Amino acid sequence: PGATRPQYGGTLRVELRQNAETPDPPALLGGGFTIARWEAGRLAVYEADENAGGGRPFLGSVEFHLGRALRDQASDLDLGKADVVELGPGELRRQPAGRRVWSSSPVRVLALVFAPRYEDARVREALALAVDRSAIHTVLLQRQGEISGALLPQWLSGYAFLFPAAADLGRARQLAPGARPITLGVSDAAARPIAERIALNARDAGLVVSVTPQTANADVVLAELRIASADPAKALAQIAEALGLPAPPREASPNTAPNAAANASPEQAYAAERALLEGFRVIPLIHLPDVYGVGARVKGGPGIAPSGEWRFDNLWLEGARP
């Protein structure tokens, strides 16, 4: 019976892929912890706050180890060197029966993003129509997430289903003649099989696409963008900024408040997103959840909110020593 009673103390070890480009430490919801150490892109350590408003959390501290490959994370979880690790589709498939898995709502969008210099709108549209999202979702992603032609996920906007996501090879073949070869950059090795599948789809439409790990000079990049706000208009503006696209249009009038974007109606938000997607400079493919494998000594939880943010105030470690 004592094993299930919350215990104080112990260090929760979390491993993530986030790398040296990450400027800020992971955000924690719910309070209860203060950051004690931050080595940018490598390590973040949080200590329990004895004076937390909601009471001291059970965990003594939390360590985030960043820049860890998915395969290494899975190995560390199996060996008991980590308590919480990210799971890609391949790792999720290999999880032993009975292991707990935490999953958020779809909070990342996988998309093809063309370089500003790539001017041929017909070829951009041809590639958009050639991609077989369904095969990628079923085979490569093990049905994780949701197929979509929208930047914002359905749970957030309510209108994602209005953007077409079906392949149309016939139309793609009509647009493809005369297209020069395209380079598709993918920096994340875990996403390379998806890029290779897109190249195969493109070939079926008469396009020549070669996959490269170099993204700087690629014609188009397979990118992953995080939905960073629960407000549709704000989330859309942040995605546009991250992609270097013009800010989404909004109704302008002398009385427009500075935060008018945050108060946009669903119709305005839909129109703004449609404007961003016109011209096929960005081609949304699939919305993905954050998925984590959890070690046996972790109790309580889940430790993530539907928004994907961390929440450790209701976790404890079995066998922890205060």
Per-region residue spans from a language model:
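Short, solvent-exposed loop/beta-turn-alpha elements that line the ligand-binding surface or hinge
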Residues: 3-4, 16, 21-38, 54-58, ...
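Ligand-site clamp/hinge motif
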Residues: 51-94
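Paired acidic/hydrophobic, glycine-rich loop segments that form the ligand-binding mouth/hinge
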Residues: 82-89, 219-224, 284
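Structural transition elements
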Residues: 142, 146-178, 186-193
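Short, well-ordered beta-strand elements
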Residues: 10-17, 31-35, 44-45, 60-66, ...
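Bilobed "Venus flytrap"/periplasmic-binding protein-like clamshell domains
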Residues: 18-22, 30-54, 169-175, 181-198
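Ligand/substrate-recognition segments at binding pockets and active sites
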Residues: 173-228
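Alpha-helical secondary-structure segments
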Residues: 11-16, 61, 79, 106-149, ...
